[in-house]
């Protein structure tokens, strides 16, 4: 008996070396101090971790976020910008990685960098080939 859980072969869970970032979404709140960070990954067999860092126009850290072994390929979280005053342009760096087995160093699968300005509330969407 052959049971198929996935109809679309492109949507089948992938091994860790084939997991990719499909898109990153940012929604800047009206206070210009918070942003919703959203990400969509390809389906995965093993749960990846994600590191997100934001640096300001002066190259200083403006925010960070770590997701350890996510269970879902699509989610969003709110980040807070640390800057007292806006320092455009900001650079968002997202690293998709695996941190186990524990006796090995972190295995980086993909890294994406996007630049954006904090000027007005709204949504930004960055799509990638996966």
Protein language model regions, located:
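Extracellular Ig-like/FN3 beta-sandwich strand-entry sites
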Residues: 47, 87-93
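Short, compositionally biased P/S/T/A/G/V-rich stretches that sit at domain boundaries
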Residues: 1-31, 129
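Low-complexity, Pro/Ser/Thr- and charge-rich linker/hinge segments at domain boundaries
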Residues: 116-130
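Short, surface-exposed loop/turn segments at beta-strand-coil junctions that are enriched for proline
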Residues: 82-88, 99
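Extended low-complexity, serine/threonine- and proline-enriched intrinsically disordered segments
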Residues: 48-63
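Short acidic/polar inter-strand loop motif in beta-rich domains
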Residues: 96-112
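Aromatic sugar-binding surface patches on proteins
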Residues: 71-80
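Contiguous beta-strand segments within globular domains
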Residues: 23-45
């Amino acid at each position: 008996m052959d049971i198929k859980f996935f109809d679309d072969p492109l949507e089948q869970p992938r091994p860790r070396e084939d997991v990719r970032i499909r898109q990153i979404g940012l929604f800047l709140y009206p206070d210009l101090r918070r942003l919703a960070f959203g990400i969509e990954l390809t389906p995965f067999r093993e749960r990846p971790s994600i590191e997100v860092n934001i640096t300001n126009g002066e190259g200083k850290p403006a925010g960070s976020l770590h997701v350890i072994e996510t269970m879902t390929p699509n989610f969003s979280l709110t980040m807070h910008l640390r800057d007292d005053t806006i320092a455009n342009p900001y650079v968002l760096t997202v690293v998709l990685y695996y941190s186990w087995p524990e006796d090995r160093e972190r295995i980086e699968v993909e890294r994406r960098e996007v630049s954006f300005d904090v000027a007005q509330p709204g949504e930004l969407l960055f799509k990638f080939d996966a």
